[in-house]
Amino acid sequence: MENLIHRRSSDWRWHLDPNGRLRRKMTRQPLRIKRVYQPPDTEDGVRVLVDRLWPRGLSREKARIDLWLKEIAPSDALRHRFHDNPAAWEDFKTAYCAELRLPPAQSAVRDLLERLSREPVTLLFAARDETRNNAVALKEWLEERG
């Protein structure tokens, strides 16, 4: 378990790693997830659509999306595989996290992390299942990175 040292600068926090070395981590703004069909809120910050396809029946004006990161969405093959077998949630998360490490997604991940260092971000998704979707997996993956 990491011990926090309460020495802060504007964008960094200090902590002790498991080996007792002093390290610094970039602080992050709040990261939320929300179904794209829900109305925008003032606390949403930057609204980022993380689906590869545009949500059905939703106009761009009503969605009020600030950024559409198709590159960060699961591949079509992975999306279809999960759609055919929703019980394979853990397998989906593992495969999706592997895709996030590949070059097409890496620059989008960097852009997202850079925004998170400056302002709140809400990841938007269209799936009906609010607990098992790519935005949930992406949020978990980003939070594991500190």
Regions found by a protein language model. Give the residues of each.
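Tryptophan (W) side chains
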Residues: W12-W14
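Residues lining hydrophobic/aromatic ligand-binding pockets adjacent to catalytic sites
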Residues: G20-G146
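Extreme N-terminal basic, low-complexity initiation segments
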Residues: M1-S9
